[in-house]
């Protein structure tokens, strides 16, 4: 039951999927981050299912397909990651000291650099999805739990920017060593599946899957450095 409560906390926090309300107490928070990749699994399944249906059973254009695929993660998560991304772009682009960046992160207003960053993000995502074919979708679907596994590892491994806030709540409540092991297993499984699917498609796809995994790891390292 406790693990189900942890699952409910993870899904309710990082998605708009309705789940039963549970108490955010110490026992329920211990393993909540273990289930962060579950949100990615749900997103990936929706991406694969809807994307495959659009490409194989409809005559929709590339732009419509790309727009739908770009919006699915936003609708599933409620935009929580985009909100953090926009705040981070504003803070980094200020080139201020640590205190100024933290102040910008707390500011509810959206700055010019956040708008520019979001425009760049959606332009890139639209462009990438416009080139997708149905046989690419399984590998693409695995990226969502992989990214959340790496994000969860950072939560229980890296020092927080400040000593308060929602992220600190998840850090303080987690059984860090066990959660880290579970998330590493998640990441290895996702990476392994991506490489296997690439191998089934041929050598070029193995290289492509490896490149995606490498890019995710580079972002993870950059996040630690940042």
Residue ranges and their predicted role:
Residues 1-78, 96-102, 110-226:
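Hydrophobic alpha-helical transmembrane segments
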Residues 83, 93-94, 103:
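Glycine/small-residue-rich loop that forms an oxyanion/phosphate-binding "nest" at active or ligand-binding sites
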Residues 90:
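Carboxylate-dense, calcium-coordinating segments in secreted/extracellular and ER-lumen proteins
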């Amino acid at each position: 039951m406790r693990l189900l409560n942890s699952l409910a906390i993870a899904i309710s926090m990082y998605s708009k999927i309705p789940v039963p309300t549970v108490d955010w107490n110490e026992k329920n928070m211990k393993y909540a981050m273990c289930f962060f990749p579950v949100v990615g699994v749900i997103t990936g399944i929706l991406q694969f299912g809807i994307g495959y249906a659009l490409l194989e059973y409809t005559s929709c254009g590339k732009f419509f397909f790309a727009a739908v695929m770009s919006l699915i993660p936003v609708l599933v998560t409620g935009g929580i990651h985009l909100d953090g991304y926009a705040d981070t772009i504003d803070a980094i682009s200020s080139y201020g000291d640590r205190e100024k960046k933290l102040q910008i992160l707390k500011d509810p207003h959206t700055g010019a650099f956040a708008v520019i960053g979001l425009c760049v993000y959606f332009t890139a995502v639209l462009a990438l999805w416009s080139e997708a074919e149905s046989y690419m979708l399984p590998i693409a679907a695995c990226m969502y739990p992989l990214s959340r596994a790496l994000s969860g590892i950072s939560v229980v491994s890296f020092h927080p920017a400040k000593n308060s806030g929602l992220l600190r709540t998840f850090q303080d409540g987690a059984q860090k060593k066990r959660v880290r092991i579970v998330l590493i297993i998640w990441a290895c499984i996702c990476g392994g599946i991506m490489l296997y699917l690439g191998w089934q498609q041929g050598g070029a796809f193995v290289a492509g899957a490896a490149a995606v995994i490498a890019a995710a790891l580079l972002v993870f390292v950059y996040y630690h450095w940042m």
